[in-house]
Structures are given as structure tokens and as C-alpha cells.
């Protein structure tokens, strides 16, 4: 490693080159999150519900997690989104407009015992799903 009086240029260049060994830096610099993410880097996205699906939880849990298949309005991609809350799936019908967000797993991926589900439903027809489940709001008729 250069450490002389006039070594600043080489030190800087070496640092720039070695940064690419850090996988987090390389992914960020190449913009891979925006390229692979269905929401294209946005915090939330709107979509139309195509169907309700039940997804089996991974071992050792035994449950059918209630999810929906959503087609995003911005790019037409289809994703699976989890419906959090007891009986939340009953407030969601096909062709409803839902707002989805990341489910909050590590590195922007799936969370808990739900494999391949990276998103959760936050709103149905503009009303918060949590409010609907609690009974604080009514679902508007579209």
C-alpha cells in the first residue's frame, strides 16, 4: 500500500476499486433494487386485486396465510401481497383497488414463515385495512 508524501491519488483510486468488493455498495451503485423491485424503488404502489390465494406457512408452522394476487397499475407486474389482521381477507374483493407496501423483511425480502411474499396490503379502495378490521371505518362502494 502506498503511504508516501504524494500517494493520495493512488490511495483514492485503490479505495474506489476495493469498494466494489462490498456487495451492498455494488448493488446500490448498480441500482439493482430499483431494477428488480416490482414497485421500482417506490415505498408504496397501487394495484388491482386479481384473486385471493391461501399460502401455506413454512415449517415448523402450520397455517394458511391469506394473501391476494395484485396487478400493479404502474407497470402491470403481478405480485402476491399478504393481508394482515384477523378476518382482513373478507374486506377485500376481486377488482378492488389496493395500496401495497413492502412487508418489512430483511434486505427488502419476505418476512417470517411466508416465503415469496414481499408485500402487504395497506389500503382497500383508499381506506386503511387496519381501520376496516377494527370496525372504525366502512369500505366504500366503488
From Swiss-Prot:
Signal peptide bounds: none
Keywords, sorted A to Z: Ribonucleoprotein, Ribosomal protein, RNA-binding, rRNA-binding
Compositionally biased residues, Basic residues: 7-16
GO annotation terms (biological process): translation
GO molecular function list: rRNA binding; structural constituent of ribosome
Function as written in the Swiss-Prot or TrEMBL entry: With S4 and S5 plays an important role in translational accuracy. Located at the interface of the 30S and 50S subunits.
Subunit comment: Part of the 30S ribosomal subunit.
PANTHER family membership: 30S RIBOSOMAL PROTEIN S12 FAMILY MEMBER
Family per record: Belongs to the universal ribosomal protein uS12 family.
Name the UniProt record assigns to this protein: Small ribosomal subunit protein uS12
Amino acid at each position: 500500500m502506498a503511504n508516501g508524501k504524494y500517494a493520495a491519488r493512488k490511495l483514492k483510486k485503490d479505495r474506489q476499486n476495493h469498494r466494489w468488493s462490498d456487495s451492498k455498495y455494488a448493488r446500490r451503485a448498480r441500482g439493482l433494487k430499483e431494477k428488480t423491485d416490482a414497485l421500482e424503488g417506490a415505498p408504496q404502489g397501487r394495484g388491482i386485486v386479481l384473486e385471493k390465494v391461501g399460502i401455506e406457512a413454512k415449517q415448523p408452522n402450520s397455517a394458511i396465510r391469506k394473501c391476494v394476487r395484485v396487478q400493479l397499475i404502474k407497470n402491470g407486474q403481478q405480485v402476491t401481497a399478504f393481508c394482515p389482521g384477523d378476518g382482513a381477507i373478507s374486506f377485500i374483493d376481486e377488482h378492488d383497488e389496493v395500496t401495497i407496501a413492502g412487508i418489512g423483511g430483511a434486505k427488502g425480502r419476505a418476512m417470517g414463515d411466508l416465503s415469496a411474499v414481499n408485500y402487504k396490503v395497506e389500503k382497500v379502495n383508499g381506506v386503511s385495512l387496519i381501520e376496516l378490521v377494527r370496525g372504525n371505518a366502512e369500505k366504500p362502494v366503488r
